[in-house]
A protein has these predicted regions:
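Alpha-helical membrane-targeting segments
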Residues: 1-31, 249-274, 346-366
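Secreted/processed peptides and extracellular or luminal domains of membrane proteins
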Residues: 48, 52-55, 288, 306-307, ...
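Short, intrinsically disordered, charge-biased short linear motifs at domain edges
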Residues: 27-37, 265-271, 285, 321-331
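Flexible mid-to-C-terminal extensions adjoining Fe-S/redox cofactors in radical SAM and related proteins
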Residues: 279, 294-366
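Radical SAM enzyme [4Fe-4S]-AdoMet core and its adjacent flexible, acidic
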Residues: 1, 132, 136-288, 292-294, ...
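Cys/His/Pro-rich metal-binding microdomains
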Residues: 43, 47-50, 283, 338-341
Length: 366
């Protein structure tokens, strides 16, 4: 099935259509925010993630090509996540398919910076393949020096991550579409030291500095691990973070835009942790989706509930996305049977919330 004309409408019109889809069930649209989890394999042994324990047959390039053809030109924002994506040797080709077929405005690559040889070999090709889109490379740093290595369960990760940042900066000199960010997961393992951590990481002068809260996710195998900081702990960390962000705003246009969304996200996340319920409507299952390494389609990675497998449905995203299983997932989310501060989905939710979007615009301008 090919995407409908409405799926390719300009984003402002599609946002209105998603609101109608959420409230009335029509018009039915494919997701604008797509996350591709391309492997569970990972050399890290993070205190906040057990995804490496999962073993599945990863999608091939040909399977991605078939899937992308079923949603050609639809996603606005594509995130390529893992595991550690760089265990794959075909990333430049995958990103070329994303650019050629999906043609998103933004491509996001979160990475731990650990596999130096593979990164040096593949990152230049990824940057080249994404010309025409904005590429955001977010290097994950949760602590400083050996403390970071301890949280990530990988000796030497700190120094290797800094090397990845240096490589990205060299590539940025001739590739203005590349934005370099640093990303921190705030957990019970680092929340008390977070004010010091964020000061030192900001001193590295990334285009943007972002954080998200550690969550108990089905995808990550962390349900029951008690890694999420308390609402009080997070509020204290966010207070310092927001103050630092406002006093030292990014001069990079894309970096400033990301920071503006993040400033709103920090407030939203704090409210969700305090109230334990959705603060603004969630559009996971309507406007945002994730595809697992073996082709399962999820509305979100926190619940990681498969609404169908692409391998079993002819690699047709619409067939899975508009299935009875997907409708049941959407009904559950609309009934507010879940609530979480998942950062990726929250971006989309904020775009679809007049309250949040107004605050984001204010953050960008002031």
């Amino acid at each position: 099935m090919t995407p409908s004309a409405l799926d390719r409408f300009p984003l402002p019109l599609r946002l209105l259509a998603y609101r109608s889809f959420h409230r009335f069930g029509a018009p039915r649209l494919l997701p604008a925010n797509l996350t591709l989890s391309v492997t569970y394999t990972c050399p890290s042994r993070c205190a906040t993630c057990d995804i490496w324990q999962k073993k599945v047959p990863d999608f091939t390039l040909d399977e991605y090509r078939k899937t992308f053809e079923s949603m050609r030109g639809v996603p606005v924002w594509v995130t390529v996540s893992g595991g550690d994506q760089f265990v794959r040797s075909d990333l430049p080709e995958l990103f070329a398919l994303i650019r050629e077929i999906l043609r998103p405005k933004i491509v996001n690559l979160p990475m731990n910076g650990l596999l130096t040889k593979q990164i040096e070999k593949q990152l230049p090709g990824i940057v080249e393949a994404t010309r025409g889109s904005k590429l955001i490379v977010n290097v994950s740093l949760d602590e400083i020096g050996e403390r970071h290595d301890a949280i990530r369960g990988a000796r030497g990760n700190w120094e290797k991550a800094l090397g990845t940042i240096r490589l990205a900066r060299e590539l940025q000199k001739t590739n203005p579409h590349l934005t370099i960010g640093i990303h921190t997961v705030i957990s019970r393992h680092n929340v008390e030291r977070f004010p010091e951590i964020q000061r030192e990481l900001r001193a590295l002068r990334p285009d943007s500095y972002i954080t998200e809260v550690a969550e108990e996710r089905v995808e990550l195998g962390t349900v029951g691990k008690r890694i999420t900081p308390t609402a009080e702990q997070y509020a204290g960390a966010v207070k310092d973070l927001v103050s630092a962000a406002r006093n030292r705003r990014s001069r990079h246009p894309m970096g400033r835009l990301v920071e503006s969304f993040r400033l709103e996200y920090y407030d939203l996340c704090r409210e969700i942790l305090e109230r334990g319920e959705q603060v603004i409507p969630c559009y996971a299952g309507w406007a945002s989706a994730q595809i697992s390494p073996d082709g399962h389609v999820w509305g979100c990675c926190v619940r990681a509930e498969s609404v169908g497998n692409l391998r079993e449905n002819g690699y047709d995203m619409a067939k899975v996305w508009f299935s009875p299983e997907a409708d049941r997932f959407r009904k559950s989310v609309a009934a507010r049977e879940c609530a979480c501060p998942l950062a990726n989905a929250s971006y989309t939710n904020m775009l679809l919330s007049p309250r949040s979007l107004t605050r984001v615009a204010r953050n960008y301008l002031w």
